[in-house]
């Protein structure tokens, strides 16, 4: 695999049945209207035969599934044309901790090291009636059929490409049933399906997995982009949320990034496109189980982004979902990195946003709920951070319209210019 791993939750009918009561939670009080997307970042991806690390004190579930492999660039693909964009399929295992809620992104449950084994790509034309088997230590443990998915492969590719450009090598995990197989250290997990080579991985106590030898991917053009929601108390109050007790972390896909003096598209028929000036922390060396006291040693430097959000698309599932935050070109970012040494205190910087020359947003990183060292320590506790990974630290309180010029700046780090255009102008 060489691309982004997208995955979909709540896509099996058994999940929809199991979560009916939860679907009535405020504020939406409805089941998901669209596919519920998430991302498996590069630290999760391993190949056949590599160990799945077992986190101490946790329950671990094997989620046998199949991955659609994108064969060519796909943007706004119609369902009936989807087959033209599919290079093939691969067996995969969406390893996860149990989830008690789908309200927030499941970073700690889904994005730990080695939590996404993927097998070899096979050039099959259709997997809409495929039985997927799981064996534990050579014995049958579970099976299910893809005909029970809420949305099939073609529908998922069409739905995702509506807002996110897919590139060759990107993958889409098609989902898992509600009931999955519990696994323990010492187990060998084998995923099988007709027409595919088996995908087999040992489960190993994470303390025995010292270093990741390799990723079965080509070098990434940039690292994983983590982003923070509600990390300024005034922004949380503006959105009528209590400040979180634990960081609200979500992931942004590579398609969302654009540069300085570029344009971002405001979708038609929406009301709430928010601009969000953010300080971005760039990781300089591999970090795993880093203490808060040592965390700044792993920072290479800083840059600036504008983390636009289309809040019209918020639902109750993995808020803020990919339709809100990972649309094409929705995250302008400066390409230059200011070295850590040039910023003595990243927690004493002024952030400003100007719209058409008018100051609309101003805040200070002194008001961060979770500091830079805390965020690095928090993330590295359950996943490996790699050089080039980035953490967008959140935004103070502060809508943008077609034709607006939006300038965001972070004191001492940089100034980023972006213009908002309509869907018609962008064509």
From Swiss-Prot:
A molecular-function term among this protein's GO annotations: 5-oxopent-3-ene-1,2,5-tricarboxylate decarboxylase activity
InterPro entries per record: Fumarylacetoacetase-like_C (IPR011234), Fumarylacetoacetase_C_sf (IPR036663), HPA_isomer/decarb_C (IPR012684), HPA_isomer/decarb_N (IPR012686)
Pathway terms, separated by semicolons: Aromatic compound metabolism; 4-hydroxyphenylacetate degradation; pyruvate and succinate semialdehyde from 4-hydroxyphenylacetate: step 4/7; Aromatic compound metabolism; 4-hydroxyphenylacetate degradation; pyruvate and succinate semialdehyde from 4-hydroxyphenylacetate: step 5/7
EC number: 5.3.3.10, 4.1.1.68
First and last residue of the signal peptide: none
Cofactor(s) of this protein: Mg(2+)
Keyword Metal-binding among UniProt keywords: yes
UniProt GO BP: 4-hydroxyphenylacetate catabolic process
Binding site for a divalent metal cation: 276, 278, 307
Catalyzed reactions: (2E,4Z)-5-hydroxypenta-2,4-diene-1,2,5-tricarboxylate = (3E,5R)-5-carboxy-2-oxohept-3-enedioate; (3E,5R)-5-carboxy-2-oxohept-3-enedioate + H(+) = (4Z)-2-oxohept-4-enedioate + CO2
Cited function: Decarboxylates OPET (5-oxo-pent-3-ene-1,2,5-tricarboxylic acid) into HHDD (2-hydroxy-hept-2,4-diene-1,7-dioate) and isomerizes it to OHED (2-oxo-hept-3-ene-1,7-dioate).
Subunit and partners: Monomer.
Protein name in the entry: Homoprotocatechuate catabolism bifunctional isomerase/decarboxylase
Organism: Escherichia coli
Gene: hpcE
